[in-house]
Amino acid sequence: MPNEIFTINLNAQAIIPEAFILLGIVGTLLVDLAGEKTASKWAPIICYLSIGSSLLSLALQWSNPVESAFLGSFNSDNLAISFRAIISLSTLVSLLISWRYTEQSGSPIGEFAAIVLSATLGAMLLCGSTDLISVFISLETLSVASYLLSGYLKRDPRSSEAALKYLLVGSAAAAVYLYGSSFLYGLSGSTNLATIGLEIINKPSFITSLALVFVLSTVAFKIAAVPFHQWTPDVYEGSPTPVVAFLSVGSKTAGFAFAIRILSTTFSSFDEEWKLLFTILAILSMALGNVVALAQTSMKRMLAYSSIGQAGFVMIGIVSGTQDGLSAAVLYLAAYLFMNLGAFSCVILFSLRTGSDRILDYSGLYQKDPLITLGLSLCLLSLGGLPPMLGFFGKIYLFFAGWANHQYLLVIVGLVTSVISIYYYISVIKMMVVKEPQEASEIVKSYPEINWGIVGLPPLRVALYTCVAVTALGGILSNPLFKLANTAVSETPFLQDIIATANNIS
């Protein structure tokens, strides 16, 4: 009988998507041992099979989610499935745009792919973790792999500096999380997030508030919210560009998934407190991220500060707490996947051809490379929230949900900072479409001949076309995507209490 109960509670099928990613890690490491030539041929194929199988198993789980697995430490509900799908897709696109970059830098492809898949594994597990211990293991799996990726260009001192900064700040964030977790365990005697929430519901105290602050600090670090953002610009600038692309979407999505789960279960009785703190973080992130981005001269640093501002927009949906607000947050993260990785695809392609990251060097690019100009322009317009791009509809859903829940200040700040962001996005576009040849940068004047036949460029081309197409077809895709996000939220049991509370306030 005990063995029967254990088997029922284990529900190992919940992590089949993660199991495929794990097989991919093993496979890429094995081909890496066989030599660089073998790894270059087989590592991409193994990654595609691994991620494709993971996405397929997530799709099959959609109609039959596993509510509790591994003795209550993991939950494969529809919300977790949605976030894990976004992370898997972000990994797939990040790998597609990384093969040529990795080969040109002289780094081992099999080893690189294994570390990216390891980070993906940690991020996906974090989305469904429902126990303090499983959260920490997932968090550290993601973090350690991210540190390795940031410093992957061993010959580049900026990459080593980025890895060291990321390691130091990330270690501090992990220590803060453990300290907050120790308070929660001491107050409740349990490590299960839902059980802790039930135990502390009648125990409002200074210790509980301190635990909330510590946990929120960890969340803010993962999503790069102000004032826990200091690592972001330096790490983004120094890390390999494909790594930055993955961190900007995959790591951030995992952070938001963790935030929604722990705030809605463990701290559901402290919703006024955490919503106030989240409101402050959102306002600071939108304001500082978009204002400081105006002064950047590096494309990667500009996108780093842009990502800080984008995190603030997502927080509007979470603070609203309504079904529409949470659905809009999921939708916007899905939209952010395509428009941000589309922009990074163009940045990587330009960097491969010129070796430059300076915004000024994009001057006159339209004359030499219309494809990069068009793709980057569409993605930047979408990030700015201009119609009819996908980003416009994502922001509209977020702002409507916030306004309906009386989050007027957040919505007004969001609108103002969106206008600011449009200015620096359009400045880049204007620079690229300079008409007079003499106004083009020296880099563009000596632009190399475009050759898509080079090894590693066809996958990058596929990623670029896909991201730009999805971003540009926002008007058609926004409604079905929102319906999927709405289904994920409405069919996730632990969210219903916070939604009911938000509806009562409205």
Swiss-Prot record:
Reactions catalysed: a plastoquinone + NADH + (n+1) H(+)(in) = a plastoquinol + NAD(+) + n H(+)(out); a plastoquinone + NADPH + (n+1) H(+)(in) = a plastoquinol + NADP(+) + n H(+)(out)
GO BP terms in the entry: ATP synthesis coupled electron transport; photosynthesis, light reaction
EC number: 7.1.1.-
Entry's transmembrane regions: 14-34, 42-62, 79-99, 108-128, 132-152, 167-187, 206-226, 240-260, 276-296, 302-322, 330-350, 374-394, 409-429
Signal sequence, renumbered to the chain: none
Source domain of life: Bacteria
Family: Belongs to the complex I subunit 2 family.
Name under which the protein is recorded: NAD(P)H-quinone oxidoreductase subunit 2
Higher taxonomy: Bacteria, Bacillati, Cyanobacteriota, Cyanophyceae, Synechococcales
Gene transcribed to yield this protein: ndhB
